[in-house]
Amino acid sequence: MPTATNVENGRITQVIGPVVDVEFPPGTLPDIYTALKVTNPGVDERQDNLVIEVAQHLGENTARCIAMDSTEGLVRGMPVKNTGAPISVPVGQEVLGRILNVVGEPVDERGPVAATKTLPIHRSAPLLTDLNVKVESFETGIKVIDLLAPYLRGGKIGLFGGAGVGKTVLLMELVNNVAKKRGGFSVFGGVGERTREGNDLYHEMIEAGVINKDDLSKSQCVLVYGQMNEPPGARARVALSALTVAEYFRDVENRDMLLFIDNIFRFTQAGSEVSALLGRIPSAVGYQPTLSTEMGELQERITSTQKGAITSVQAIYVPADDLTDPAPATAFAHLDATTVLNRKLTEIGIYPAVDPLDSTSRILDPNVVGKEHYAVARAVQETLQRYKDLQDIIAILGMDELSEDDKLTVARARKIQRFLSQPFTVAQQFTGNPGKYVELPDTIRGFKEIVDGKHDDLPEQAFYMVGGIEEAVEKAKKLTAG
């Protein structure tokens, strides 16, 4: 990225909340996105402890900047150091198991990060010639996802779900499976969510073994946080910081990465706040006029290249459940698959609570996943949809009033519903059930046998919380024997 040839320091001329105006000597104005540093005694005692990023040029000598931390304590006339480069974050194996903030500083009280390499957070998307054009699915080992809403390797997945339906557990299982089966790492970008949730996630990852506190090099995940209480500048940039960490593992270490962003809506929201602070005229519903551009710059960097892939799972908050709101609507345009978590499934104890009828995937196509996978997935969905249609009749008249065919459909649908549940490795300390990773061919075969009626004689509880179909058969034998 180009930088001003004459790197000279400036002075603060104005502070309005998180916006700081800095005046430079003539001919030394830093480029847009350049990181500047100020010593702010209002934050802590360290030198150069506040990073501000150039956002606009006002006149010939003044840069309008957005602060990445609190501006309390700044006064006019304070010296500002021009770093001559954009915000850069540490990358590589040394950041595994650590919690970083938007500028790459550790916030987990475990000492400095020993990384030798840093990368700027503002980077171009990979060239078209570097992209991997092969469309292939990303096996997660989770039956309901692999069968009905498969993830695209290097794709973007929207994760929808309210509070307490299992988003975090699903995420941790994905982190665990990617590490164990693919040797890949994961990066979690906490964008504008609650600090308590970030802290809980860190401790849950330690308990689940995803982060090894005693030997960080054995950890499988990096956490990059810009939480709700932080200024809009930090929340608008932290997703880029997390993505940069993931890009290094993809491009230099040739790994398959999983990037989790929670929550992509807060990225847009922070961008809207920054836009208003910079005095831009708002667009629809008060959002920034550059909404699609900002989203595109982030999403286009998340892709599959010849070296590796970044597959991204993004939690999406839908304001007032309005799917036409510009923020979620802009995110939808980039998604390859959606995983919808349904509270009704948690109420009947089906975990993961992924809705098999609401979740979708662009690659559930016979040309990509194969004819057998597609046919089995559609048969499963048809059976479940028929069961859903019959539920009103069952509630009013009871099962006895159904035709024989419908009774059979209901019995198979209930078995399918239970077979879509699965014990997770990261939850085994709570459930006592060892976690199961189910290979895709086993998943397809298991559901095909249920749909074809091969297991009509087995009790439905035999299919609950098992891995492959063989386990269900074994469980049925134990149930009948017991």
From Swiss-Prot:
Source organism: Anaeromyxobacter dehalogenans (strain 2CP-C)
Keywords: ATP synthesis, ATP-binding, Cell inner membrane, Cell membrane, CF(1), Hydrogen ion transport, Ion transport, Membrane, Nucleotide-binding, Translocase, Transport
Protein name: ATP synthase subunit beta
Organism domain of life: Bacteria
Membrane topology designation: Peripheral membrane protein
Subunit structure of this chain's protein: F-type ATPases have 2 components, CF(1) - the catalytic core - and CF(0) - the membrane proton channel. CF(1) has five subunits: alpha(3), beta(3), gamma(1), delta(1), epsilon(1). CF(0) has three main subunits: a(1), b(2) and c(9-12). The alpha and beta chains form an alternating ring which encloses part of the gamma chain. CF(1) is attached to CF(0) by a central stalk formed by the gamma and epsilon chains, while a peripheral stalk is formed by the delta and b chains.
Reaction(s) the record says it catalyses: ATP + H2O + 4 H(+)(in) = ADP + phosphate + 5 H(+)(out)
Matches recorded under InterPro entries: AAA+_ATPase (IPR003593), ATP-synt_VA_C (IPR055190), ATP_synth_F1_bsu (IPR005722), ATPase_a/bsu_AS (IPR020003), ATPase_alpha/beta_chains (IPR050053), ATPase_F1/V1/A1_a/bsu_N (IPR004100), ATPase_F1/V1/A1_a/bsu_N_sf (IPR036121), ATPase_F1/V1/A1_a/bsu_nucl-bd (IPR000194)
Main subcellular location of this protein, as a coarse class: membrane
Molecular functions (GO terms): ATP binding; ATP hydrolysis activity; proton-transporting ATP synthase activity, rotational mechanism
EC number of the protein: 7.1.2.2
Family note: Belongs to the ATPase alpha/beta chains family.
Binding site for ATP: G161, G162, A163, G164, V165, G166, K167, T168
Gene: atpD
Disulfide topology: none
Function: Produces ATP from ADP in the presence of a proton gradient across the membrane. The catalytic sites are hosted primarily by the beta subunits.
Annotated localization: Cell inner membrane
A single cellular component GO annotation: proton-transporting ATP synthase complex
